[in-house]
Amino acid sequence: MQQLNPSEISEIIKKRIENLDVSSDAQNEGTIVSVADGIVLIHGLADVMYGEMIEFPGGVYGIALNLERDSVGAVVLGKYQDLVEGQKVKCTGRILEVPIGPELLGRVVDALGNPIDGKGAINAKLTDKVEKVAPGVIERQSVDQPIQTGYKAIDAMVPIGRGQRELIIGDRQIGKTALAIDTIIAQKDSGIKCVYVAIGQKQSTIANVVRKLEEAGAMEYTTVVAAGASDPAAMLYIAPYTGCTMGEYFRDRGEDALIIYDDLTKQAWAYRQISLLLRRPPGREAYPGDVFYLHSRLLERASRVNVDYVEKFTNGEVKGKTGSLTALPIIETQGGDVSAFVPTNVISITDGQIFLETSSFNAGIRPAMNAGISVSRVGGAAQTKIVKKLGGGIRLALAQYRELAAFAQFASDLDEATRKQLEHGKQVTELMKQKQFSPMSVADMGVVLYAANDGFLEDVETSKIGSFETALLSYMNSEHTDLMADINKTGNFNGEIEATFKAAIEKFKATQTW
């Protein structure tokens, strides 16, 4: 055994003392003063940013929302029941970020981007901030490319363009979610990536939506962000921003994306709850003063960005492409009251609204859209040529029918022209009905709208309109396959196509096979 002499021992001790790290590791720490309903009051955090992530004991995180002179109000993202007064908390120096990228397609995640579908970890290469500033005026481009919803009533009367914000508004249980899900399914061959944000919904409802998307083969280009009814209010508040950040990944790289917020009423309720617990002064309907900004800063992020923006963002990797993020926010009204605080706010922020009404839904008209109140402020420029040319007469026919139907209730005898107009309105109303999960192609819409506009429905009984439409489309797709494929590709409509349509429909009507 080797012996150490005293001088060597002293040298080793000297070296150990010299190499000892005595520098202090400064950490910004505070103490929990109170915990209540997911809101934590912290004393002693000196340098904390607004929106900064705060680390609590047990690996739970929160966001600093109230910065006061001697305390910080934070909202907990997760389980707060284990937090106790007197525990130490730390600042992280980071703003909340979530995973982004194509790896999220086909997955169901929570409001923080954690997978909740049991399919394993998401190996996303990138993360991005949840709260971001919307593109500026110079970076935007006007909307001139269409997004097909697959609903003839909407694509003809309330067209939606890529980069638009179109509100879907109506009472509960009248098909708002169904309309949004069908729009996602209709994007199958368009290359548009979709994000569906479920806010405050039942877990069974979210599971049903995911199942429907999987059955339709739509999950492969869709990400579902789920903040269920049993999740903390903070998750419901943050979920739309998380989904928006995931959608912006595609927009900023010269691709097109669609995001659905289902629904923003519940996000406003969650934010109201958080604000009241943080003791912020309540305003109209007990909402805080910045509830307009809550939705405006979210919806302004949906936009169409120009070629320069995409080129600059990708450092020249993507050239000559514009990107877009189209938003379909959903707002739930109570008793059809669109003049309530949150509905009026969102109507003023968006580029139009699709108003669904209970009376139409109960009468069997689905989608239950009110053609008079529903409007698209910018989508007209994006409409496909064939639908734009043939769809104009539909809105007029429905508007006149609505007016005359109200008048006809009180009039006993009507002249022939009025009776004809009423009958035509009835037929168009019947024609605009469409089953769920059956989106229509542009060519199919063109055929149906042409038949309605050019009087081919006059001698068809109203009760047989549905079977007439099905048989006509089946005939057109089998007898004129190339023409229908060409219309789907180009969206064109000219004299030659019109003549073909006319001859084909006349030939079909002669068969009487419907």
Swiss-Prot record:
It comes from the Bacteria. Coiled coil: none annotated. It is a peripheral membrane protein. SUPFAM superfamilies: C-terminal domain of alpha and beta subunits of F1 ATP synthase, N-terminal domain of alpha and beta subunits of F1 ATP synthase, P-loop containing nucleoside triphosphate hydrolases. It is found in: Cell inner membrane. The keyword Nucleotide-binding applies. ATP binds at G170, D171, R172, Q173, I174, G175, K176, T177. GO terms for cellular component: plasma membrane; proton-transporting ATP synthase complex. InterPro entries: ATP_synth_asu-like_sf, ATP_synth_asu_C, ATP_synth_asu_C_sf, ATP_synth_F1_a_nt-bd_dom, ATP_synth_F1_asu, ATPase_F1/V1/A1_a/bsu_N, ATPase_F1/V1/A1_a/bsu_N_sf, ATPase_F1/V1/A1_a/bsu_nucl-bd. The record marks S374 as: Required for activity. It catalyses: ATP + H2O + 4 H(+)(in) = ADP + phosphate + 5 H(+)(out). Its main location: membrane. It is an enzyme of class 7 (translocase). GO terms for molecular function: ADP binding; ATP binding; proton-transporting ATP synthase activity, rotational mechanism. Keywords: ATP synthesis, ATP-binding, Cell inner membrane, Cell membrane, CF(1), Hydrogen ion transport, Ion transport, Membrane, Nucleotide-binding, Translocase, Transport. Its EC number is 7.1.2.2. NCBIfam families: atpA, PRK13343.1. F-type ATPases have 2 components, CF(1) - the catalytic core - and CF(0) - the membrane proton channel. CF(1) has five subunits: alpha(3), beta(3), gamma(1), delta(1), epsilon(1). CF(0) has three main subunits: a(1), b(2) and c(9-12). The alpha and beta chains form an alternating ring which encloses part of the gamma chain. CF(1) is attached to CF(0) by a central stalk formed by the gamma and epsilon chains, while a peripheral stalk is formed by the delta and b chains. Belongs to the ATPase alpha/beta chains family. Produces ATP from ADP in the presence of a proton gradient across the membrane. The alpha chain is a regulatory subunit. HAMAP family: ATP_synth_alpha_bact. This is ATP synthase subunit alpha 2. The gene is atpA2.
